[in-house]
Amino acid sequence: MQFPPPIHGVSVMNDIIRNSTLINSKFQCDYINLATAKNIDDLQKNSFFKYILTLKIISKSFYKMLTNRYEYVYITIFPFGFSFIKDSILVLLVRFFGQQPLLHLHTYGFRENSIYSKFKKKYYTFVFKNVNVICLSPLLIEDISHIYKGQVFILPNGIPQVNFNNTYNNEQNPITLLYLSNLIKGKGILLIIDALERLNRKGINFIFRIVGSEGDIKYPHITELIKLKGLEDKVIILGPKFGDDKYEEFKNSGIFLLPSNYDTFGLVLLEAMQYGVPCISSNIGGIPDLIGDGRGVLMENISVDDLELAINKLLTDKLLRQNISHKSFDYYISNFTVNIFESRLSNILSGNPDLIV
């Protein structure tokens, strides 16, 4: 499992499992940190340090399986690059020792990465042989349907509940828009700035707050872009925030923006829903399971045009914002708290899963 740092959706969920009283009291667990990146910007890079660390991870895993007999070996597997090579070696190692891999897919890309490569498809199929699989949503099963024909356990993410009443303020003027995520191009921060430039030119009032750690986009670039677009008096750059400071951002926001082509589920959407903040996001991965059916606004296309329309729609429709706030808050409470997540995972590990597809 990958643990923080760096902080991203997978490492956060793995940390929840590692610290779960329910899981650790019910099962005897050993944990090995599979993370090889030092920070968000390091995730997609290869280095000598990563190779050495990977050898240590494989050696430690070898020793653990040599000296223990596990019912499941839980691996959060990634579909791309060196991360997949490392993860696939671990899967094969588990099978070599006659133990059962349990692969938890937090991202998609297996289909896209193998559609034009027979070798990759064959290797994916080989890796996914004789394993159990967990997906975040039934909507994500299609990504592996060409390489895996077995049953899939469905386990949506859940986050700790820190807000117990819907405190959404629908009387803001101007309305505060929030982006709170790592500064990664695929998460749509540049798309947001382009859409807000258009709205600003039309005289539509708003405040936009940017919160998050640098990734493949750096804050100096964001600052220059904001000046170029004439948004200096509309945009507030805050950098990364955590804990209570982060929760205050949600509490004081009117609309949350995540026009991502990157996320399969979006933990940060759950954080916004916990505060009843209406969300705008992409119609990809498992995101429709969160904010579909009137619990948010889904963009059919990840484009400046669609994002501009979605933002304008929420900015100008107070009743819609209120309805979304009520629905999203209630849906989070009913489905996505950390207690619900831990219970569902416990049921999977006990052989009594809540949902199999």
Predicted regions and their residues:
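Nucleotide-activated donor-binding/catalytic signature segment of Leloir-type glycosyltransferases, i.e.
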Residues: 221-241
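Conserved acidic donor-binding segment of nucleotide-sugar-dependent glycosyltransferases
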Residues: 293, 297-304, 313-318
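A short, well-ordered alpha-helix in the C-terminal region of glycosyltransferases
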Residues: 306, 313, 320-334, 341
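Short hydrophobic beta-strand element within catalytic cores of glycosyltransferases
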Residues: 278-281
